[in-house]
Amino acid sequence: MKRDLDRLMAERNIDAIVVEGPDGLGSANPDFNYFVQGADLTGTVIKKRGEPAMLLHSPWEQIQAESTGLVLIPTNRWNLREIMNETGDRFQAYVELRRRIFTDLGIGGRVGFYGTVHASEHFALLTGLAQKLPGLEIVAEFDKDIISQARLTKEPEEIAIMRRVGQKTCAVVQAVVDFIQSGRADGDTLVDASGAPITIGHVKQLLRRELAAQGLEDPQGTIFAQGRDAGLPHATGDEGAPLK
């Protein structure tokens, strides 16, 4: 639970945690989503030990940012264009921007970094930042990191969300069962009322419609396979194959 974060940080001697939320990686960024409660926005969450978490966000995402309940800090507090003009180099400008952010917010000491990122550019950014801030010690956790440990236990609000998603998922599964049961057997093939074969593709079309109707996401597709494919891990199924 989030209330465990300060204890976990103290146990590991972590002064602050930084959770990156870059553009385009929202659905694959559980650490960032954990703090922003699934809000559709980009930014950076920073939490100092013993203090509330802060969200650095773009000013045009103010409404989404407000829904997170975090302490809000718009990024236009720092003038990136001015920094660009001073450094004359895009990479150095972003390093300097992050240095100013950390300095102004009092971020230093042992700092852990989390979130789904573009590995190469983020490694370059952290390397440059460490050179600019001698008092910064970058802490990397390989296994059982602070956030994953905090997420092992759930707040009542999280459990309620999980139940709602479970109920919606069951409704989608029931719609698929009803659709398949509406067909009839023609030999070893399942056909619809007109006698046309019902295919895996038809089932997946229904799945996508029902998921959308329930407000659920399907970013990587749903596995629905039969026969040999069903025995192969992560085989998604041949959409043209009729149901047997």
Model-derived features: positions:
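Short, internal active-site loops enriched in acidic
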Residues: 23-24, 116-119, 227-231
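Short beta-strand segments at enzyme active-site cores
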Residues: 19, 176, 219-220
